[in-house]
Amino acid sequence: MPKIISISTHQPPYTLQQSNAEELTKELFYEKIPKLERYLKVFDNGGIETRHFCVPPEWHRTNHSFEERNGLYIELATQYSVSVIQACLQNESFLHSPISPKEIDAIIFVSSTGISTPSIDARVMNKLPFSNQLKRIPLWGLGCAGGAAGVSRAYDFCKAHPKAKVLVVCVELCSLTFQPNDFSKSNLIGASLFADGAACILVCGDEIIIDTKKSSPAILATGSKWMPDSENVMGWDVKNNGLHVIFQKSIPAIITSWLGPYIEQFLLEQGIYSEQLTHFIAHPGGKKVLKAYEDTLYLSSQKTDISREILRQHGNMSSPTVLYVLEQFMLHEGQVEDTGLLVALGPGFCAEAVLLNWRA
């Protein structure tokens, strides 16, 4: 089975305490949103303490055009991608020796917070010594599900090409999409929740033998689920001044009524019950989302501790977030024969599930 050999994450330079983010939001929306003080409680109740951003807080005190925001997205997404790829291919926590970019057969680039044609992966190829025959697979529009979907597509590629080495790179700069003149509740909730980040994994096919320092998660199976007529649950409303967040409060209820039965079915098809999972690697979409996972899949709160800790330290970074969670399992938790389920939700409305088993 294809294995995840190495992983890395990249933290943007500007760290903001949640209390300071609340004060900035209060300043920007003062006398513009009715009952603002009541809505600002989401900053205190979301289980987030710090978040990291690609721009300083004062950047949001002035208006920026869609063109300016997107230009900055292209510049920084390229920069962060280069950094996180280099870190993944040289990660001494997992690899005995570095792997050259020239050895990579495909790159799956995942993002939803900016637009670039050619896609960011092409720009990265001009900065690192990849082969000019590298297969590029950009994925756009999957939002928070993008990290798990990238793992799934790397699995598909490596099943078809067992000698392949594939990078999955996720970069999201959610702060560049913040709209200071959008006074909707969705925008306010987004301001309390979303952050910036980047992550990269290296997935290798069955015929690639790399001696690693730790046991590695093999990908046993993947699954996808889509909900018809659900475009309004989560996504972007694209307007002249940029991307406006769509974010419905029904997501935890959807986990209970729609996702839970699918996950049980997916696991049963692999001969596993949810109680048999050693690790639950959930995208922490929010505190209520994690609680819905626990209730629906009959998990103890201990099973979501790492996801909750990533949410506390980083907020919701969209697609890279579930890989931040996976990194902690790969560094500190995974032992040979452990079984894990990686799950994320995103626009569509959709879910991605990946079943993992740690191997020597």
What are these model-predicted stretches?
Residues 76-93, 120, 198, 254-269, ...:
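Short, well-ordered amphipathic alpha-helical segments that serve as non-catalytic structural scaffolds
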Residues 116-122, 168-189, 221-239, 286-295, ...:
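Active-site-adjacent elements of ketosynthase-type condensing enzymes
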